[in-house]
Amino acid sequence: MRVLVLGSGVIGTASAYYLARQGFEVTVVDRQPAVAMETSFANAGQISPGYASPWAAPGVPLKAIKWLLERHAPLAIKLTGDVDQYLWMAQMLRNCTASRYAVNKERMVRLSEYSRDCLDELRAETGIAYESRSLGTTQLFRTQAQLDAAAKDIAVLEQSGVPYELLDRDGIARVEPALDSVKGILAGALRLPNDQTGDCQLFTTKLADMAIKLGVEFRFGQDIQRLDFAGDRINGVWIDGKLETADRYVLALGSYSPQMLKPLGIKAPVYPLKGYSLTVPITNGDMAPTSTILDETYKVAITRFDNRIRVGGMAEIAGFDLSLNPRRRETLEMIVNDLYPRGGDLSQASFWTGLRPATPDGTPIVGATAFRNLFLNTGHGTLGWTMACGSGRLLADLIARKKPQISAEGLDISRYGNSREVAKHGQSAPVHQQ
């Protein structure tokens, strides 16, 4: 059985790998010249199942108003006049309740924990190397109010059986010695010892090589134009003016997925959250982080690779704009100087931006659609790296009609209740272009 995977980021590549392991004949198509060239290229590098949390949370609407007035705010909104942007923000606001937050976080943690287990198994079986570390994640709280507010997250961690540790200032210095000199500005921390780090782009490149050895074909520089359909089946995909056919189709196009689905009558509430990162060469390993640090105030992660620090985070709701905002670089540099002033050479840092495909409830869309042979693996937001292996393996099981190792409840598009409207056959969607 032939499967055509659209998109070669970490999600599409993981999907292809796990499908090939199940014996499918897999072809991956992407517009870029190699895998992981867009959102997967320079993300923060953290694999943090326990910190899998939706942006839509109680109190966020009021915080967002305050953030609009701050220079180093973690969230910025640039209104584009796009109706989809307004609808997405309205849906997000509806998820900012305690009850919805608990449901959404449970779904995210469920998939993230499974994904980490799949990654551990993959690493043990294959020895795949991607500058990984398994030294946990430490979330820093600069105020007592932030520390107190972590109680709701801890409740979900306990419910999900995720190990955690609350740290005072001395405890922070114990797990992250380079923070000893600045611990006075911190109120405490929450540490998840089972979290990991790694270079997502390097991992995806290595995984693609392994997939090729299993028979997967990668085709790069291809213009994915539209899906061709009739009734409840996909007939093929128009690629560079030619109709490509398969038995099953997987859409893993990140933020560009909804525009490809709209002509089919499928409303996928995925919208780009623009994020930024700095990659900083380490000058003094003893003064750099040992693993991943999350700065709760600025919603930024600082991650240690072998000889580099990756600083990433923030979110701009600004459509598909990929311009580099110098103010965001200023914020990232400020945070590095604040916490690790002697760890790296900021003058040699590389600045990057990418579009994370976010759903209004934070949970990705993984699973079947109203079309019998079309499957989605998209909407992972800031957690594509964390959820990649689990999402790929879960989707492969669903396509193979095998019982998944975790519950898939609440993960597919049917949770939005509008999985398909009547669509006209042959309507074009020339969206996956630059």
From Swiss-Prot:
Signal peptide: none annotated. Its cofactor is FAD. One of its GO terms (biological process) is D-alanine catabolic process. FAD binds at residues 3-17. The keyword Cell membrane does not apply. It catalyses: a D-alpha-amino acid + A + H2O = a 2-oxocarboxylate + AH2 + NH4(+). Keywords: FAD, Flavoprotein, Oxidoreductase. It comes from the Bacteria. InterPro entries: DadA, FAD-dep_OxRdtase, FAD/NAD-bd_sf. Its EC number is 1.4.99.-. GO terms for cellular component: cytoplasm; plasma membrane. GO terms for molecular function: D-amino-acid dehydrogenase activity. The keyword Flavoprotein applies. Pathway: Amino-acid degradation; D-alanine degradation; NH(3) and pyruvate from D-alanine: step 1/1. It is an enzyme of class 1 (oxidoreductase). Oxidative deamination of D-amino acids. NCBIfam families: PRK00711.1. Belongs to the DadA oxidoreductase family. This is D-amino acid dehydrogenase. It comes from Pseudomonas entomophila (strain L48). The gene is dadA.
